[in-house]
Regions:
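Transmembrane helix-loop-helix hairpins at the membrane interface
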Residues: 1-153
Length: 156
């Protein structure tokens, strides 16, 4: 949890904020921080053991989602909590045989090659559901013009 929390402070706290002082485009901010987040994770053994492309896609999608919810919510608490929950899940519940953190998991994935389709669609569905749940819970979107919430058009 400490490592994931520190990553969020670095990427969604300092880096995202620093880039926002230079560029006023939320899409660019989310894409750039997610890209840097992905490249940093290449130091882990997973991309080299299971496939660089699918691994980078998974990390990029996670980084993009975390950056997006940070930009919309205005704070990094959700991203930090989600990142910690994700890391606990992948290391304690469903682990990889050759992981950066070797811990006993309830289930162990023993494949030697992860495919794109096993990453993209499940991640897209998962992040879409979380986005809707968070949006409703925290009233991110204004579909009624009299409210002070942000409108979907202002995200771009």
């Amino acid at each position: 949890p400490i490592q994931a929390g520190l990553e969020e402070i670095i990427f969604r706290g300092y880096l995202l904020h620093a880039l926002s002082l230079l560029v006023n485009n939320r899409v660019f901010l989310a894409l750039s921080t997610a890209s840097i987040f992905s490249v940093v994770h290449l130091s882990n053994p997973e991309p080299w053991n299971y496939g660089i492309g699918p691994y980078l896609l998974a990390i990029f999608m996670m980084g993009f989602f975390l950056s997006t919810i940070t930009l919309i919510d205005g704070g990094m608490e959700l991203a930090m909590g989600l990142h910690i929950a994700n890391n606990l899940w992948v290391h304690l519940v469903v682990g990889l045989e050759n992981s950066v953190i070797n811990t006993p998991s309830l289930f162990l994935i023993t494949t030697s090659n992860i495919q794109y389709e096993s990453i993209f669609l499940p991640s897209l569905i998962q992040f879409s559901i979380m986005f809707v749940v968070f949006g409703l819970k925290y009233k991110w979107f204004n579909f009624n013009k009299s409210s002070k919430s942000i409108s979907p058009a202002s995200l771009i």
